């Protein structure tokens, strides 16, 4: 669910790692077992590296899709003295979408007749930007389960958190431009193997893997959803009236 969680845990002492000696709570490779659930997992093998490992974890929270980070400390490292000092923490910026890709997205949105906005969990911290884009673009909106509440249920252009609905899926197939912001469009939102999206798809996501997975976009914008939605809102022509009667019909 894109939640930043810092997990600090112990592992057997360095001489015992991977030896299968039957130590208490021994796992042959704890770091690898945890890795698929995390942004990264790391075994800190030197007490002097502890502070830098923590700094790297918080840098990941700031610049990537928020996900858990696991730092494991061998018992002998945890007990060792360390000259920590001040860790080096780079203030890396989040990814920035290419200007040419933003231009292409603006052109598609301005030329759309039936635009549709899908907002996911990656927009929960930029609800104002999502609503401003919706209002100016004249699109209808669908929220995923994780994005529920970003667009108020009372908003006349909000179809709702209803990708399970056949009526919603039908409208998704009718949309000529679909803007998917901060969403994986995962199976658990629709319970279909693959949604039918014949229109031009614009994806906005902070995670490069998610951006290209399952639904390759006509335009992929690798960036923070709030920043991109704000820029698109500033640049699109607007003036299109949302088909709120259709949204009410689908609801």
Language model regions located:
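N-terminal alpha/beta PP-like core and its mobile active-site loop of ThDP/TPP-dependent enzymes
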Residues: 1-245, 249
């Amino acid at each position: 669910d894109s939640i930043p969680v810092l997990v600090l845990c112990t592992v057997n002492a360095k001489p015992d790692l991977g030896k299968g000696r039957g130590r208490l709570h021994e796992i042959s490779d704890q770091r690898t077992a945890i890795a698929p659930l995390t942004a990264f997992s790391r075994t800190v093998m030197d007490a002097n590296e502890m502070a830098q490992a923590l700094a790297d974890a918080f840098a990941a929270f700031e610049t990537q899709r928020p996900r858990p980070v696991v730092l494991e400390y061998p018992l002998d490292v945890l007990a060792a003295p360390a000259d920590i000092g001040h860790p080096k923490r780079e203030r890396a910026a989040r990814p920035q979408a290419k200007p040419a890709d933003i231009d292409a997205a603006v052109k598609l949105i301005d030329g759309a007749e039936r635009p549709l906005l899908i907002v996911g969990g990656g927009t929960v911290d930029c609800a104002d930007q999502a609503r401003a884009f919706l209002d100016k673009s004249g699109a209808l909106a669908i929220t995923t389960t994780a994005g529920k509440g970003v667009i108020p249920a009372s908003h006349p252009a909000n179809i709702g958190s209803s990708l399970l609905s056949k009526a919603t899926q039908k409208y998704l197939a009718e949309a000529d431009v679909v803007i998917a912001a901060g969403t994986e469009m995962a199976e658990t939102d629709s319970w279909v193997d693959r949604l039918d999206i014949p229109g031009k798809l614009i994806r906005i996501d902070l995670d490069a893997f998610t951006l290209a997975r399952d639904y390759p976009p006509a335009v992929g914008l690798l960036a923070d959803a709030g920043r991109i939605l704000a820029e698109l809102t500033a640049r699109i022509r607007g003036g299109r009236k949302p088909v709120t009667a259709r949204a009410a019909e689908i609801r």
